């Protein structure tokens, strides 16, 4: 059922390799029976992430689009989001009953943020393998995203990372804003991300016709 004010648009950002596309894939597969979904990915010169989602069967191919940003991918989600806004508009035209649009940014750094014109909610994904100092470094993704996902917690023993330190630093940097510790390879923590989206985004589940 379409939302009165249009679909919930969720921006998913984070450094390369942190698990953004994996999260997109899992969210699509878990939620597609309850919501009408579309997925938009951003890459600089390719459509690799969109092609991955198609190969994985995340959604039907007509519900997945890849945006080639060229140059700086951060501009395409912030200062000049016109390409992504056009992609969202195209999806809404094709699927008037859309409930949810997931928008994955290109290779981000800690300073990347989504324009409020493009995303209603933002999720920022970091991974333990990059080091347990990442939450303490701050940056808009760490401090201002609606939900911070600390992924690949299973790798902590292998890279000498302290999950306790990451939790303490995340709480200190984010204040009351929530964060989730995950191992998306095993879907651990996915339920908490979905619960956040449904509660914060005001989604109301209804069965989706096949």
UniProtKB/Swiss-Prot annotation:
Binding site for GTP: 14-21
Gene Ontology CC: cytoplasm
CDD domains in the record: UreG
Keywords recorded for this protein, A-Z: Chaperone, Cytoplasm, GTP-binding, Nickel insertion, Nucleotide-binding
Protein's UniProt keywords contain GTP-binding: yes
Compartments, record wording: Cytoplasm
Pfam families assigned to the protein according to its UniProt record, in alphabetical order: cobW
Single GO MF annotation: GTPase activity
UniProt-listed InterPro entries: CobW/HypB/UreG_nucleotide-bd, P-loop_NTPase, UreG
Disulfide topology: none
Subunit structure: Homodimer. UreD, UreF and UreG form a complex that acts as a GTP-hydrolysis-dependent molecular chaperone, activating the urease apoprotein by helping to assemble the nickel containing metallocenter of UreC. The UreE protein probably delivers the nickel.
Protein name: Urease accessory protein UreG
Organism: Rhodopseudomonas palustris (strain BisA53)
Name of the encoding gene: ureG
């Amino acid at each position: 059922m379409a939302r009165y004010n249009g679909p919930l648009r969720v921006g998913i950002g984070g450094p390369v390799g942190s698990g953004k596309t994996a999260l997109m894939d899992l969210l699509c597969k878990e939620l597609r029976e309850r919501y009408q979904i579309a997925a938009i990915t951003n890459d600089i010169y390719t459509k690799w992430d969109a092609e991955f989602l198609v190969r994985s069967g995340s959604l039907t191919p007509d519900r997945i689009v890849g945006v080639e940003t060229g140059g700086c991918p951060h501009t395409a989600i912030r200062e000049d989001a016109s390409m992504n806004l056009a992609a969202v508009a195209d999806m809404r035209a094709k699927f008037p009953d859309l409930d949810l649009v997931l928008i994955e940014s290109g290779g981000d750094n800690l300073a990347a943020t989504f324009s409020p014109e493009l995303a209603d909610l933002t999720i920022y994904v970091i991974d333990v393998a990059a080091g347990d100092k990442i939450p303490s470094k701050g940056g808009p993704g760490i401090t201002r995203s609606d939900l911070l996902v600390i992924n690949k917690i299973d790798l902590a023993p292998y890279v000498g990372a302290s999950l306790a330190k990451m939790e303490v630093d995340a709480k200190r940097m984010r204040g009351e804003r929530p964060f989730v510790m995950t191992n998306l390879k095993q879907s651990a923590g996915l339920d908490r991300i979905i619960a956040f989206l449904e509660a914060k985004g005001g989604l109301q589940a209804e069965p989706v016709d096949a």
